[in-house]
Design a protein with these regions (language model features):
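A short Gly-Trp-Pro
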Residues: 2-135
């Protein structure tokens, strides 16, 4: 799906989704409908439908965006250096279609409140970049 034209994506996505997924914008914090979602299921790429994250790896980071301590697997996302905004960050993209999802930070939980081990990672993902499928 990485070879799809921008015209294809403009027709498929809403205006906000296009800005975030294709132009690397960031949605307003605390505005996304999936931020407080507590249901069990899978979070998929809004653009192509590829599974990216699961509810059992989601946690409340207090940042205003859905946060996950790991992806569904190592092949579902691509990581790359992002030097925009005068700082170096790690961009998270869908491995299947190349759409921008958010950023990866090293300030995630080492230990979860329920006793599970975390990864120390925080995948900070735009809510509008995700489509949730309930289990």
């Amino acid at each position: 799906m990485k070879n799809k034209s921008e015209d294809f994506w403009k027709k498929k996505l809403t205006g906000e989704q296009y800005k975030v997924l294709r132009e690397k914008a960031t949605e307003t914090p605390f505005s996304g409908e999936l931020l407080n979602n507590k249901e069990k299921g899978v979070y998929k790429c809004m653009a192509c439908g590829s599974p990216l994250f699961t509810s059992d790896k989601k946690y409340d980071s207090g940042t205003g965006w859905p946060s996950f301590w790991n992806a569904i697997d190592d092949e579902s996302v691509e990581l790359s250096e992002d030097n925009s905004l005068g700082m170096t960050r790690v961009e998270v993209k869908c491995a299947n279609c190349g759409s921008h999802l958010g950023h990866l930070f090293d300030d995630g939980p080492e230990k979860m409140t329920d006793g599970r081990n975390g990864t120390g990672k925080r995948f900070c993902i735009n809510s509008c970049a995700l489509n949730f499928t309930k289990k």
